[in-house]
Amino acid sequence: MLLAKHLTGSELIKQFIPYAMKTTNTYAYTQTGANLADFASVQILWSVSAWKNSGQGSYLLYLRAAADVLSGLCQPVEREGKEHGEGVSVDYAINQHNALNGSQYCMQLYSGSYGAELLNRIVEGAVVLVSEFSLTATAMSELVNVVVEGMGWMGYASRMDFHVNGRAISRGVPSNAHIAKWAEVLLPFADTANKEALNELIRRTIGDESNNQYYSGGRLFWVNDYLAHIGSHYCVWAKAISTRTVGGESGNGENPKGYYMGAGTCFLTHHGKEYEGIQPVWDWQRLPGTTVEQVPNFKWPNTAWGVNMWGSHDFAGGVSDGKRTLLSMELSRKNVTHAYKTVMATDDRVTCMGTGIDTRSVMFPVVTCVNQCIARGPVRYLTIDNQEHTLEQGSLTADNIQAVYHDGFVYTLAYFRSRPTVTIEVKSRSGAWSDININGSPYTVTLPVFSLCIHHQKGENGSYCYSVSPSEDLLDGALLPTATVFEAGMADEHIVYDGEAVMVSCFDAELTRRWAQEAGHGFYPEQPCVYIAEQQDAQVKLTCADPTQTLENLAFVIKADERGTPLVRLVVRLPQGDERGRSVTVNFLID
């Protein structure tokens, strides 16, 4: 660019253009996604420069080629295609730097960092490329879908979710302000419904979440094992990992402590500042939603470019019927193994549960972190004798706490066998951005931090269960228990009933079948799966998915005799190819 600025037209043609054509083009390299979009943007510059300074129309062929590349980048890629899943996926999330584990590429969710760069380049191109050089109508339609169906669910109250930023989480506070710019450019290309969604996005990016219509309910991004749910007064994002996906990466000296990101991490927000700048002071062994052994002076594993960030099992994924969203996984990581973990979200509540947690091999305490966020105001908590207490600073560990209030959320603690021991902590923590990013500031940052953790005894069948509700007060009616685990052997089925529908994660179908027969229930799945069933009179609306992404069908027993022998089965055909893992909805009648 410096050469282009200072050279004459003839010198440009002789020196700059040949150099640019050789080093930055869309036809001689194997770039994908955002990296390919960068090359296309530079090719637009040098092709126009060459044409204007030489008068040779042949250079416009390179301009058209760059436009074709940008159009192609708007289209979903195949997970097992030549891009190895890097770019826009069929669920309209964006992947980049997918990590190779053996012979399989594991998807890395990167909508907020590389994805933002990709969309910036495409939108810039769409603005300047006109007439015969315009992006195709199909490309612009798909670009609208990427913004509306993808990006729009990943931001709330002017902030972007940590999960979608990869190693860029170590650079600063992720904002979603750029979405408004894209939405404004795309409005002329959108149909009526998407115009309404884009206008809602423009309003939301300035922090106004007061009147969401389109962005109400949930989305499950099946390619990346990722949940986004926007309730009436809050938003939750959760990430699972499997043999198909990773939770992030380190690289170039960035994000060396991100090993547990995606391992059940769950972030809650209602005003957007819950995690404002917390990264340098975080205890990275206590990320919200994770169940982790607390190892002193922990040596962080190598996670360069996603290595070791993949999950341990096929079972990871979820289901959404629009109003309710569920994400589950089985995970073994370090000495904490075979944990069944689930997040279930409705309009006014998030329920999180874990069972079957094997900690027999650990050397140090194991905790499930309910939350670790910026402390705002005192913490109030309720003991089992219904006495209210306040913790302004310090740490409290007890086994008689039933609910905790902090910064607009009530955390209700349930239990399966015995009441859990929990630790509430409010204290200042210090760190530096350079601790998590080689290019970060070395100056010490000190912030007040609230954390709530559940302790696990050493053994083979650990568990936890809690719900979180947006609330203005500790005793604001948010304490009704909503989560129930029907224990079959090792609690292999997680169930929540919200008054209208039942949300279920079935990890072991055989134990579920035995429990259903013993309990006299006539409806149960015949294989591990996740589903939401809503009954209205004699009709049941069933939304289901296969988290292993290996099955062609799901079978459900909907009627059995008194001995539990199946009489009527429902077989649901599942999507295949790049759609595998997507939810399917069917309706059936019951007697």
Task: Name each model feature, range by range.
Residues 223, 402, 462-467, 575-591:
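C-terminal beta-strand-rich structural cap/linker in extracellular carbohydrate-active enzymes
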Residues 1-4, 43, 122, 495-497, ...:
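Generic low-polarity alpha-helical segments
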Residues 564-570:
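Surface-exposed loop/edge segments in extracytoplasmic proteins
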Residues 118, 125-564:
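Extended polysaccharide-engagement surfaces of secreted carbohydrate-active enzymes
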Residues 54-65, 471-476, 577-581:
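Alpha-helix capping and helix-coil boundary motifs
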Residues 542, 556, 572, 586-588:
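Preference for bulky hydrophobic residues occupying beta-strand positions
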Residues 1-175:
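Aromatic-lined, polymer-binding surfaces characteristic
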